Amino acid sequence: MIQSEEDLEYERNVEMFRLKRLIAKLESMKGSGTSMITLIINFKDQINIHARMLAEEVGKASNIKSRVTRQNVTDALTSTLEKLKLYNKTPPNGLVIFCGLVQQEDGGEKMIKIDLEPFKPINTTLYKCDSVFHTEEVRKLLEDNDKFGFIIMDGNGSLFGTLQGSTRTVLLKFNVDLPKKHGRGGQSANRFARIRIEKRRNYLRKVAESTTACFITNDMPNVKGLILAGSAEFKNDLQKSDLFDLRLQPIVIKLVDISYGGENGFNQAIELSSDALKSVKFIHEKKVIGKFFDEIAKDTGKYVFGIKDTLEAMDMGSVDILIIYENLEYNRLILRDANDNIVNETLHKNKCPSGSKYKNETTGVEYEVLDNIPLTEWFMDNYKKYVSHLEIVTDKSSEGSQFLKGFGGIGGILRYKMDTDFDDTENNNEWNDDDFI
């Protein structure tokens, strides 16, 4: 089944958030000595080369004088090698492995073993044996991948470029010699006016044709948005012109007045459009939350919000799009009672047990805690069993902030209308820390 661009965007967003959380965890870990191994394999590299290298490193580790350090490093290298042996060949986007003994809060140590297939190609090869995990190259995967097009035009010429992350690229530039307004009267003035109008029209046609050549690939825009920048009315004339490609008109996100042309104008246009570019990054988030708000405004009954009702709707299989705030303050507990029955509960972080035992305050039943993970992570690992799409949102956009404050940061768009009795405290936005399921 071929996935739509919208489906792929949902999945990319989840993978980005998953990696973001993993990096934060890895960066919080510390080890004693140099027993924490970071191995990054370029997508072009061969697995067996790195397997041989690790085997050689195990041999070298036998020369470490400290018995404890020698054992820790050897264990970490062996664990890394075991992870590597799970792969017959390098995955399409490369491979990242983190292995090593990590210090725990209780003073003990725990062996961490993580293998990661990046969601986009990684071009770096790295091997480090240190007291920390090295995440710098993996963090680069989180950098903004959206590409924006810029058209800089004035009476002297035009420049076409792109901005992707912090990389600025000039695609095309050309000069033009437009006649100035003629000061003399009579027939001469009329003739020069006609020539001037014709040359401006030809210039506009060349800019429009170049715009299509630069920013259309395979019959589709190859940039997320377009910025039209320039002095005078050239940029406005281009946007209004019937020569301007209809496929590009919907992605024009801003018109910018600048004082310069050429590359100086390009730099100025980037600076002056920063707010608009930042806003575009949240377009998908704003669109999904907007759909949720529309269902509520129209009172369709095809919406749900709040921890309790949303999880119940998920269990019934009625949620199409699950929307959650990225920093939900709830955990998902997997519990076992005295009769070996497995029970799931969702608790606010303030109410979560710190040890291996948990007593339900309402029923008085005691449980053994088998697992206790942030609810956001549980959603990321399990959402495909319950819903079509998962959207993880921030509070950076106005819609995201409203969703967090007004609906507790969790809700869903339903496949069909449900008769749901919403909890009064949730309807009144009085979020009860004791709320659990």
Curated annotation (Swiss-Prot):
Pfam family, one: eRF1_2
Main location: cytoplasm
GO molecular function, one term: translation release factor activity
Keywords, in A-Z order: Cytoplasm, Protein biosynthesis
Keyword Aminoacyl-tRNA synthetase: no
UniProt subcellular location: Cytoplasm
PANTHER family per the UniProt record, alphabetical: PEPTIDE CHAIN RELEASE FACTOR SUBUNIT 1
General function of this protein: Directs the termination of nascent peptide synthesis (translation) in response to the termination codons UAA and possibly also UAG and UGA.
Protein name: Eukaryotic peptide chain release factor subunit 1
Organism whose genome encodes this protein: Didinium nasutum
Lineage, top ranks: Eukaryota, Sar, Alveolata, Ciliophora, Intramacronucleata
Gene label: eRF1
